[in-house]
Amino acid sequence: MYDAVNAGKMDVILGYSTDGRIGSYDLVMLKDDKRFFPPYDAAPVVSDKLLKETPEIKDVLNRLDGKISTKKMQELNYQADNDLIEPAVVAERFLKENNYFEGE
């Protein structure tokens, strides 16, 4: 879809606001002022088993709350999808740049 709109074969497409290709194709996201589309908010999800075995993981993961903007997520996704950097490497770089491991 992104290639098609970039090539002028389409004028409008539906995509995720965090897709890294939005910036790479210089596309414009329209504001959904009618709230037609449900919000897509990423959230950590863990099993009850993991939470019981490692209760401290809750606080560790909650430190990410509100730390990744849509723009930043686009950049991170672009690195993984376009630059073909392993997602684990992209994530580790982000965490280090934001002092996530500080004090550990």
Language-model regions, residue ranges each:
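A detector of mature, structured extracytoplasmic domains
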Residues: F36-F37, R63
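A bilobed periplasmic-binding-protein/Venus flytrap-type ligand-binding module shared by bacterial periplasmic
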Residues: D41-T54
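Ligand-binding clefts/hinges and TM-proximal coupling segments of bilobed small-molecule sensing domains
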Residues: P55-G103
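A short pocket-lining beta-strand/turn micro-motif at the edge of beta-sheets
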Residues: M10-V12, Y40-A42, I57
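Active-site lining segments that contact anionic ligands and/or coordinate catalytic metals
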Residues: G15, S24, P39-D41
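Short helices/loops that flank or line small-molecule/ion binding pockets
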Residues: M1-I13
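Ligand-binding "clamshell"
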Residues: A7-M10, R21-R35
